[in-house]
Curated annotation (Swiss-Prot):
Organism, scientific name: Campylobacter jejuni subsp. doylei (strain ATCC BAA-1458 / RM4099 / 269.97)
Cofactor entry: dipyrromethane
Pathway assigned to this chain's UniProt record: Porphyrin-containing compound metabolism; protoporphyrin-IX biosynthesis; coproporphyrinogen-III from 5-aminolevulinate: step 2/4
Source taxonomy: Bacteria, Pseudomonadati, Campylobacterota, Epsilonproteobacteria, Campylobacterales
UniProt-recorded Gene Ontology molecular function terms: hydroxymethylbilane synthase activity
Gene3D superfamilies per UniProt: Periplasmic binding protein-like II (3.40.190.10), Porphobilinogen deaminase, C-terminal domain (3.30.160.40)
Protein name: Porphobilinogen deaminase
Family to which the UniProt record says this protein belongs: Belongs to the HMBS family.
PANTHER family: PORPHOBILINOGEN DEAMINASE
Reactions this protein catalyses: 4 porphobilinogen + H2O = hydroxymethylbilane + 4 NH4(+)
Gene: hemC
GO annotations of cellular component type: cytoplasm
């Protein structure tokens, strides 16, 4: 049997797809091929992500290729995957999670507190912008698009004092070797995006394919990301609004951190809870409903109106 993986052509996306392909080859001794596609998010590089917005910015073209039967599965950064899937497609697996944290890369400043007043910080994410300004209102946060290499180049050319990336991507592509300083934020400083650090394997609804993909599943990652995705789905928040949610398994307990608000950090809702591992089902939805009673929907609408 031969499996075809639909993938974006970025360096990180290709790494992720190759990683999954290797596991499938080693486990099942089958042929696995990669088919590259450009998504809307890859093409529209001049606008901030929040302005072009929309669900499936980095997934739609890959999903269409599967529905046309040109591919059997697609490997995504799960944080980019909408909560609901097109008919005929399913989230087949969530692989073992890497670090879910964010990190600051800089040529001149070893940590966040050492950044000078008015320092220029590059990031694509309103979630990061909101929390960075909450910690340091004196910083200048600038939209940073483009592939990873172009972002690193802009940092080295002193267009930015620092840039913010996901720690998982930094590790996967060895970016820490390309800059002088990497500062990893704690989850209390910067609450990560839902499913950050996890890979989501989306596939066609086919029993044989789904059986083959079972080997990619990680129970802990499934538990953590199900809480996070439930929270986002209940709030109806896409990845372009300022929401952070992270569930972290610690033995038989789970630490859940959540935040949402306005991009400038002037208004936020934030919470941190410890729950029993056995109580994870429905917790994300329940927490989101608590946020809604505190005005979360109105706050997110306000955020969307000023993006």
């Amino acid at each position: 049997m031969k499996l075809i993986i639909a993938t974006r052509k970025s360096q990180l996306a290709l790494w992720q797809s190759e990683h999954v392909a290797q596991i499938l080859k080693n486990t099942h001794q089958i042929e696995v091929l990669l088919e590259g596609f450009k998504t809307k998010g890859d093409v529209l590089l001049d606008s901030p992500l929040a302005k072009i917005g929309g669900k499936g910015l980095f997934t739609k073209e890959l999903e269409e290729s599967m529905l046309r039967k040109e591919a059997h599965l697609a490997v995504h950064s799960l944080k980019d995957v909408p909560s609901f899937f097109p008919q005929g497609l399913v989230l087949a697996a969530v692989s073992k999670r890497e670090q879910s944290t964010d990190a600051m890369l800089s040529q001149n400043y070893k940590d966040f507190l050492s950044l000078p007043k008015g320092a220029k910080i590059g990031t694509t994410s309103l979630r990061r912008k909101m929390q960075l300004l909450l910690l340091r209102p004196d910083l200048e946060i600038i939209s940073l698009r483009g592939n990873v290499n172009s972002r690193i180049e802009k940092l080295k050319n002193n267009e930015f004092d620092a840039i913010i990336l996901a720690m998982a991507g930094i590790k996967r592509l060895n970016l820490d070797k390309q800059v002088n300083f990497v500062y990893e934020f704690s989850k209390d400083e910067l609450i990560p995006a839902a499913s950050q650090g996890a890979l989501g394997i989306e596939s066609i609804k086919d029993e044989k394919i789904l059986e083959l993909l079972k080997c990619l599943n990680d129970e802990n990652a499934l538990i953590e990301t199900s809480i996070e995705r439930e929270f986002i789905a209940t709030l109806e928040g896409g990845c372009q609004v300022p929401i952070g949610i992270n569930a972290e398994l610690l033995g038989d307990e789970i630490c859940v951190r959540a935040v949402l608000g306005l991009p400038d950090g002037s208004e936020i809702l934030k919470d941190k809870r410890m729950i029993k591992k056995n109580d994870f089902k429905g917790f994300g939805e329940g927490l989101a409903k608590e946020f809604i009673t505190k005005g979360a929907k109105e706050l997110l609408k306000k955020a969307e109106s000023i993006i």
